[in-house]
Amino acid sequence: MNDYSQLEKRLNYTFKDKQLIIEALTHKSYKKPYNNERLEFLGDAVLDLIVGEYLFKKFPKSDEGILSKIRASLVNESGFTLLARKIDLGSYIYLSLAEENNNGRDKPSLLSNAFEAIIGAVYLEAGLDTAKEISIKLLEECHPKIDLQSLSKDYKTALQELTQATHAVTPGYEMLGSSGPDHKKEFEIAVTLDNKTIATAKGKSKKDAQQKAAKIALEALKK
């Protein structure tokens, strides 16, 4: 994939340095002298600032605790995966054949990392304001209703309220394992009900994995 025009159109930004967008789209499995991990590191910090400032201005009466919860619900793997899919980012990523055959183009972790890298690349070339314009536009397109109730949802609390009402029990959370290097660990958590596993999920922290697993469990119990 050497034609990035459609991706740039969706971003509403054209890279002057094409090597920068190539690096942002290169997964480490592709075995080039470069990959997108450094740009991902930068993009993660840039997005944290952009979303933090956006929420600070949007909710002038909300305290730090509420703002942190809302930001955490947007600035995470599932949140960035949603934005990546909005611009069909998976179609442009450079992957190894093994990763390609392992459905790598649709992996949340891979999509999320590539999105962070793209924003990091935009920031390097065009600055914070342009990175902000792109990020906020996509954020608002994917979340037409950004408000306290819809974005500060605590899935663990919601699951507990549901299971206590319907089963008279409190859900449990069991650590199944962790993988990856120390600076980039991924944790797997299982939600149990009456000692039976009802959902599992992975996340960048134990809390993140618990929230994801609780969300999956909620959806399953409501069917």
From Swiss-Prot:
Q: Which GO terms describe its cellular component?
A: cytoplasm
Q: Which cofactor(s) are needed, names only?
A: Mg(2+)
A Pfam family that the UniProt record links to this protein? dsrm
Cell compartment(s), UniProt: Cytoplasm
Q: Matching PROSITE patterns, A to Z? A: DS_RBD, RNASE_3_1, RNASE_3_2
Enzyme Commission number(s): 3.1.26.3
This protein's name: Ribonuclease 3
| Subunit text | Homodimer.
MF terms per GO, please?
A: double-stranded RNA binding; metal ion binding; ribonuclease III activity; rRNA binding
- The active site lies at 44, 116
Native source species: Sulfurovum sp. (strain NBC37-1)
Q: HAMAP family, from UniProt?
A: RNase_III
Q: Where does Mg(2+) bind?
A: 40, 113, 116
**Coiled-coil regions in this chain?**
none
Q: Which InterPro entries match?
A: dsRBD_dom (IPR014720), RNase_III (IPR011907), RNase_III_dom (IPR000999), RNase_III_sf (IPR036389)
Family in the record: Belongs to the ribonuclease III family.
**So what does this thing catalyse?**
Endonucleolytic cleavage to 5'-phosphomonoester
Alphabetized NCBIfam families for the sequence? RNaseIII
> SUPFAM superfamilies given for it?
dsRNA-binding domain-like (SSF54768), RNase III domain-like (SSF69065)
